[in-house]
Every structure is written in structure tokens, then in C-alpha cells.
A protein has these predicted regions:
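Bacterial lipoprotein signal-peptidase II cleavage site
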Residues: 17-24
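Second-shell loop/turn segments in exported
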Residues: 71-74, 173-184, 218-225, 232-236, ...
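Active-site SXXK
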Residues: 181-211, 429
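Short glycine/serine- and small hydrophobic-enriched flexible loop segments
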Residues: 194-202, 247, 251, 300-307, ...
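N-terminal export and membrane-targeting signals
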Residues: 1-6
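Structured C-terminal helix/loop/strand segments within mature extracytoplasmic catalytic/sensor domains
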Residues: 24-114, 120-144, 306-476
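C-terminal motif of bacterial Sec signal peptides marking the signal peptidase cleavage site
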Residues: 12-15
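Active-site-adjacent helix/loop patches that line small-molecule binding or acyl-intermediate pockets
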Residues: 100-105, 109-114, 224-329
Length: 476
């Protein structure tokens, strides 16, 4: 997602089905099968909200067959591309064409009680097969059993109309819904940091030890050798999404024998789509589509990080899953870093306070860490250029979250908690989509020289605001 200056981009080689001309979303579609079971009110609201946003109206700066599409080719280490790549897409924006098919979306809202326990959830999947979105039933353990999850496929999303080929969870061949998971981009760093903090709790890592990161070979994604404390790497990974720090943490997990146990832990907890696989033990890079996360399992992971008393849900083996999976100290550190997120520009857009674009999102407090004397936000040399103090005065919630993007991923996952006297809602929201930096709104303005460019369609901000408005009313 972000390199040292916060401006990186990646790509995927795009192919187009011969049956669907570029610039048109096919109107021909057999009625999709609906999953079995009841869905919650929050799921129904989320589906209706996503449908009303008309995500299919975004423009594609690298449509199939274009020179821009041909220049985006590597589905591995997508975050490793340069500012030149992103500038190329921005330059192509005036000639962008309508997206050729319904975008891919995986969204979950997990409602919490005042003690942090999940009480209801809504998951909606949208794809070329489910153009209006489909609400997914879950069981009492907040598990979606009637979905066949597939790995993201950069070429196949266009060529196969969103149909994946590699299964993520075994034994789901007869599931009603078949859905290709979006590549999670930098939201994968939630799994990485969870794994490192698990090692710290087990005494296999000390947070204040200096870890000498010596990659061999050096990866364009990860950069060269560094020597920092584990605590510092965690801070940089979560607050401003440093790829270098995150690669160091992945390499640390490999060196301390933490990767396989982490993936097994996710399986044991019933978080079957959370898989940190295929990374390179020599440098912590090689981030690819074998790294998977669904919005529902990500929300459940965040529920554990947030903390709740007693059993949060029951694992497949019948054992209770509790917040004791991390120590109180590790959860506090994790939450603190998520609460200092610098990039508040997808579901929440307070970094862009006061402008006509993008639309306002979740009305969060922008962390003071990034606010300069003039009220503008600068995150590791990424300058947003707007005074956020008026939005902070009107803020209603704290949003402890992690964002991510590459050219064909937009992702945001976090915990929303109302400020005192501001409505009392507490919930977790996670959104994954393929509408990354490659896709733009027709009304997107240009940014002044030296200002961080817009990363997402403003439709995600409208989604965040609509979800928060619904949750505020629910708690009245």
C-alpha cells in the first residue's frame, strides 16, 4: 500500500471477456441463487445501501486492452509499484471509461453491545453474479457456511466475469454463493501484527528488542536492511502502513516459527478465510493472492482485538474463543496503534475535511499525531492540505482502523466507538472491493501539486456515513 513517502501503486494484468464490450456492464444475467437462511436487519440495510450507491458507475483508468492495462502486470507484491505508476493512472483519468462489469465487494458490519460482545452482523457480497448484492446468512457463531470462497484472480476477474478457480476453504463445493475474495492489500497487516503480538505473549519475541532486518534478496516491496525495535515496526506497520516495517515483521514471524502456527490458529478459531500464505521467509515479501481475508472473518478478528468478556463465539472444535487470545497489554497496544491511523480517507474522509470532494464519511476524530499547526494532516510526507480541526469539533466517533489499496483493491477495517454523548453506538465495519486506485469518479477533481492524491471513489465514504447513521439510530 504505502512505501516511505506513502505514494505507491500496483497493478494487475487485465483481460476482457469477448462477450462484454469495454465501457458497458452487461445487462444479461440469469437470476442468481440466494443462500439459505435468515438475514439480519443490518444485513438487509447494508445490501440496500450498497445497491443504491451504484458502484457500477465508476470509471476505469486502465480498461481492458488499454496501454494502461498492459503496463500493470504483476499480481505479486502489488504494493511495490512506484509513484510513476500511480501518476500514469491519474494522467489517464480524463480518458477513463465506465467499468465493464459490476464491481466486486465484500462488506460486513458486526454490531457490538456496550461490553464489546457481538450481538448481530450483516455481510453482503456484490459481484458480476450478484449485481444488486446478496445478504449472507450466518449462524450463531457468525460463520457464513453457504459461501464458496475463492482466491482473487487479477486476470480472471475480467476474463471470467468475477468467477474464481482456487478454493480458499475446502468442502464448500455445494455452497449456494460462489465468491472471489478481494486481495486485502494493506489490511493484511492486521494478521501480521496479530501474529507478532501472539509471539510476544508466548515469550518468543520481546517488543523492545532490536530486530535486525537483513533481507536477502532485497525486495522492491520491502526495501533494504533496517534495525528497529519490534514495537517501532508495529507502530509503522499499523499507523502509516509501512511496507518495509511489515516485511520485517513477516520475516520475524518466519524466523521465530510463527507463520504456520498463526495460520493454524485462524483455522482453529473458525476464521477459515484468514490465511497469511506464500510470503518469502528471506525478506518478508512476496505478497500475493494466496493471502486471503473475508470481511466477516476480519471483523471477528477485530472483535477479539477490541476485547469482550467471556466467550465471543464457539470454535469448530467446540471450544470457546475469547479475547484471551491476546494479553490485555497486547490488545491495548494493538488498539492504540489502530486508533492512530494516519490514512483516514476511505470509509472515513476526515483527512479531506471541508472540501466538496470526497463526500463526508464516518464522522471520526482525526488523530492529533498527524495534525500540524495549520490544522492540516501530513502522514510520512503525504500531505492532505485541508484543515481538519472543524471536522474534529463535529466528530462523533473514534475509528480505530486499517486501510489499504492497490490499483484493484480498496480496503478499510476497523472498530467504531461513539464519543461520550454522541449516540452510544459501537460496531465493527470491514469493506473489501476491487475498486482501488485504478477506478475514479466522474466528478473527481484534480489535486494541487504536492498534495496526496485521492485513493478511492467517494462512494465508499458515502457507504461509511450511511452505515454510521444507521448504527446511531439503532442505539437510540
Amino acid at each position: 500500500m504505502y512505501a516511505s513517502a506513502g505514494l505507491v501503486l500496483s497493478g494487475s494484468l487485465l483481460a476482457c471477456s469477448a462477450e462484454t464490450p469495454a465501457g458497458k456492464v452487461s445487462a444479461v444475467q440469469a437470476a442468481p441463487k440466494l443462500p439459505k437462511g435468515k438475514v439480519s436487519p443490518v444485513a438487509k440495510n447494508l445490501r440496500a445501501t450498497l445497491d443504491k450507491l451504484r458502484l457500477q458507475e465508476v470509471l476505469d483508468t486502465a480498461p481492458p486492452g488499454s496501454a494502461q492495462a498492459r503496463s500493470l502486470g504483476n499480481p505479486v507484491d502489488k504494493e511495490a509499484q512506484t509513484t510513476t505508476d500511480r501518476a500514469r493512472l491519474l494522467a489517464a483519468a480524463p480518458a477513463a471509461k465506465p467499468i465493464v462489469q459490476q464491481p466486486q465487494v465484500d462488506a460486513t458490519v458486526l454490531e457490538l453491545d456496550r461490553r464489546g460482545r457481538p450481538v448481530s452482523s450483516g455481510t453482503v457480497l456484490m459481484s458480476p453474479a450478484y449485481k444488486n448484492g446478496v445478504a449472507i446468512p450466518v449462524d450463531r457463531n457468525f460463520t457464513a457456511k453457504d459461501v464458496r470462497w475463492r482466491q482473487w484472480d487479477d486476470k480472471g476477474w475480467y476474463a471470467n466475469k468475477g468467477q474464481g478457480t482456487i478454493d480458499v476453504v475446502p468442502g464448500r463445493e455445494k455452497a449456494t454463493v460462489d465468491h472471489m475474495l478481494n486481495y486485502p492489500a494493506s489490511v493484511l497487516k492486521l494478521m501480521v501484527n496479530f501474529g507478532v503480538l501472539r509471539l510476544a505473549d508466548q515469550g518468543k519475541v520481546k517488543l523492545d528488542e532490536t530486530f535486525d532486518y537483513k533481507p536477502d534478496p532485497v525486495s522492491p516491496l520491502c526495501g533494504g536492511a533496517t534495525a528497529k525495535t519490534v514495537r517501532q515496526y508495529i507502530d509503522e506497520s499499523l499507523t502509516w502502513s509501512s511496507n518495509g516495517a511489515s516485511c520485517a515483521l513477516v520475516k520475524l514471524l518466519h524466523e521465530r516459527g510463527g507463520i504456520d502456527p498463526l495460520n493454524q490458529t485462524f483455522q482453529d478459531f473458525g476464521l477459515q478465510t484468514l490465511q497469511l500464505k506464500g510470503t518469502n521467509p528471506a525478506n518478508g515479501g512476496r505478497w500475493s493472492n494466496s493471502i486471503t481475508m473475508s470481511s466477516l472473518d476480519t471483523a471477528k478478528l477485530l472483535a477479539l482485538v477490541n476485547g469482550a468478556p467471556g466467550k465471543v463465539w464457539t470454535a469448530p472444535n467446540g471450544k470457546p474463543v475469547t479475547s484471551k487470545v491476546l494479553s490485555p497489554a497486547s490488545r491495548k497496544l494493538f488498539m492504540s496503534k489502530l486508533g492512530q491511523q494516519g490514512y483516514n480517507d476511505m470509509l472515513s474522509t476526515t483527512n479531506w475535511c471541508g472540501g466538496t470532494y470526497p463526500a463526508p464519511g464516518i464522522p471520526q476524530v482525526t488523530p492529533s499525531r498527524w495534525i500540524g499547526k495549520d490544522g492540516t494532516v501530513t502522514v510520512n510526507a503525504s500531505k492532505f492540505g485541508r484543515d481538519v480541526r472543524p471536522c474534529n469539533k463535529k466528530a462523533e466517533v473514534r475509528f480505530s482502523h486499517k486501510t489499504g489499496w492497490v490499483n484493484n483493491t480498496a480496503s478499510d477495517a476497523g472498530i467504531v466507538r461513539a464519543l461520550p454523548g454522541k449516540g452510544g453506538r459501537t460496531y465493527i465495519v470491514v469493506v473489501f472491493s476491487n475498486l482501488g486506485t485504478q477506478y475514479v469518479d466522474a466528478n473527481r477533481p484534480s489535486t494541487p501539486p504536492g498534495i496526496y492524491p485521492f485513493s478511492y471513489t467517494e462512494k465508499f465514504a458515502k457507504l461509511g456515513r450511511a452505515i454510521d447513521t444507521y448504527e446511531k439510530k439503532r442505539r437510540r
